Amino acid sequence: MHRPLRAAIIGLGAVVPEKVLTNADIEKFLDTSDGWIMQRTGIRQRHVVSEGQSTATLGTIAAKNALADAKLTPRDIDLIIVATASPEMLLPSTACCIQNDLGAKDVPAFDIGAACSGFIYALSVASKFIETGT
């Protein structure tokens, strides 16, 4: 009997920009306060990209970290899906930029834009690709 392939997460990679923008920083150029922002959003600070950084450059670093964690190389990649609500451009997709940066040639690469739920959709799509052997 044929056992279907099962998807599993075998490596993790993450990165955030080093530059931090606090509510106090925002108070300097907007008519607002730390308390007002905190009360409505719960946010104290956020990480923002610096010159030369983008969704793709950060994604490439995260992908390399995930590959290292899984003890894999870009040659082991069969599919690249990027879930983002902040692509740096419409074309080429962020996934294709990361694919190029990794040197992962000849594999499908595409973006999913579904805001906060994008990760769940990307995980589901990736799982179906794996389970169907495509």
Protein language model features and the residues they cover:
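Conserved "HGTGT" condensation-loop signature of ketosynthase/thiolase-family condensing enzymes
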Residues: 1-78, 102
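Conserved beta-strand segments that form the floor/walls of ligand-binding pockets within enzyme
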Residues: 8, 81, 111
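Conserved catalytic cysteine-centered active-site region
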Residues: 38-57, 84-134
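Short glycine-rich or small-residue beta-strand-to-loop segments that form or flank ligand, phosphate
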Residues: 78-84
